């Protein structure tokens, strides 16, 4: 059924379809009986639960950052069965992102190219939206995990970045602003220094730049009544030496986890849509990233001896794909491009196939 729907949706621009589909789902889920019907059809079985960072997840399948940038569709995504959703990337100030078109499908390769450019409503508006979500879903400020009390059990991650106009030497200030504003409303943080769509951002993956940003956030975190896990999202295009530097730093400062990986600027994995892939700049995601992502997950796990939890992201479409990541050492997995190609039942199908 979804293949038929997808063939129609793919006739229209990718970004337009994204918002159209989610807004239709939001309208449907505004009716409680329809939301419950959707949840009963798409949520995986209760025996998929998993605990990590003192958080209890309904399952190990999450939605990666960039899908719900502005925390507008949390109820709808929970109804589709996601165990956790990573909002953002959130920046201190609102920004429009790069010029459209900026999202491209490569259907023969089951891939996407995006050069969105951290388009988001800004941290103030998003924090207020999360506050309203918390109030409406029975979450309380004294909770260790404010998003898992009473009505909702959805775990929310906050993916944070810097504004395009902020020079790299001041980037730590942008991460601090976002961290403080969102701290009360998210369950964990992901520091994003690996997007290829903000000029110069990946330079912040260098060891000393990273140390400055993350250690500063850890100091703020330690002063809070309840500390939140801080993770780092890394690029798949790092050299072995760069990756070793990141891992060594993560071990040294006791980072709570790594997200492996972001999108790639490499186009070698394309087999069919090479013309589109080379014409359009931006980050490539989906099946072409699958092998490299798994290699990095395995390398991190072996080098850290499993001491640092890993969220795997890249080319996950099926239960077999997820199992490959778990076997490589991942604790959790995130889908994004797979969600577009496989449809709303992806979480339930993956969880079922993992049994």
Where are these regions (language model features)?
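Active-site glycine- and acidic-residue-rich loops that bind
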Residues: 163-175, 202-203, 209, 231-252
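Short beta-strand/loop segments at the ligand-binding rim of alpha/beta enzyme cores
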Residues: 54-63, 153-158, 223-238, 300-312
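Catalytic cores of alpha/beta
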Residues: 70-79, 238-252, 302, 306, ...
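Glycine/Thr-rich beta-alpha phosphate-binding loop at enzyme active sites
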Residues: 26-29, 33-43, 195-206, 249-306, ...
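C-terminal helical cap(s) of enzyme catalytic domains, especially alpha/beta-barrels
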Residues: 94-110, 268-282, 337-355
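Arg/Gly-rich low-complexity intrinsically disordered repeat tracts
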Residues: 132-152
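A gly/proline- and charged-residue-enriched helix-loop-helix capping module
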Residues: 88-134
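Glycine-rich phosphate-binding active-site loops on the catalytic face of alpha/beta enzymes
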Residues: 83-95, 193-195, 257-265, 315-316, ...
């Amino acid at each position: 059924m979804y293949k038929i729907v997808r063939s129609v949706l793919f006739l229209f621009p990718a970004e337009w379809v994204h918002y159209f589909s989610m807004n239709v789902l939001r309208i449907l889920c505004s009716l409680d009986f329809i939301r419950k019907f959707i949840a009963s059809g798409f949520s995986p079985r209760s025996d998929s639960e998993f605990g990590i960072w003192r958080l209890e997840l309904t399952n190990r399948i999450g939605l990666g950052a960039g899908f719900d940038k502005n925390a507008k569709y949390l109820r709808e995504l929970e109804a589709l069965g996601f165990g956790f959703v990573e909002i953002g990337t959130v920046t201190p100030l609102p920004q429009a992102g790069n010029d459209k078109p900026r999202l491209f499908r490569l259907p023969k390769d089951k891939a996407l190219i995006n050069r969105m450019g951290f388009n988001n409503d800004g941290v103030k508006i998003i924090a207020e939206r999360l506050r309203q979500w918390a109030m409406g879903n029975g979450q309380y400020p004294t909770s260790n995990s404010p998003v898992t009390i009473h009505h909702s059990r959805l775990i929310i991650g906050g993916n944070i970045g810097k504004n395009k106009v902020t020079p790299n030497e001041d980037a730590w200030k942008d991460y601090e602003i976002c961290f403080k504003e969102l701290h009360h409303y998210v369950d964990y943080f992901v520091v994003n220094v690996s997007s290829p769509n903000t000029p110069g951002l990946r330079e912040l993956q260098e060891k000393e730049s990273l140390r400055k940003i993350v250690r500063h956030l850890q100091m703020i975190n330690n002063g809070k009544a309840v500390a939140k896990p801080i993770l780092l999202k890394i690029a798949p295009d790092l050299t072995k030496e760069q990756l070793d530097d990141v891992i060594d730093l993560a071990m040294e400062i006791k980072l709570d986890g790594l997200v492996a990986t972001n999108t790639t600027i490499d186009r070698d994995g394309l087999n069919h849509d090479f013309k589109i892939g080379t014409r359009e700049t931006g980050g490539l995601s989906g099946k072409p990233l699958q092998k490299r992502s798994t290699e990095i997950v395995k390398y991190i796990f072996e080098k850290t001896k499993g001491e640092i939890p890993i969220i795997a992201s890249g080319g996950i479409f099926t239960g077999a794909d997820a199992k490959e990541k778990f076997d490589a050492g991942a604790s959790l997995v995130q889908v994004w491009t797979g969600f577009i190609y496989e449809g709303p039942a992806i979480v339930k199908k993956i969880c079922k196939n993992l049994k």
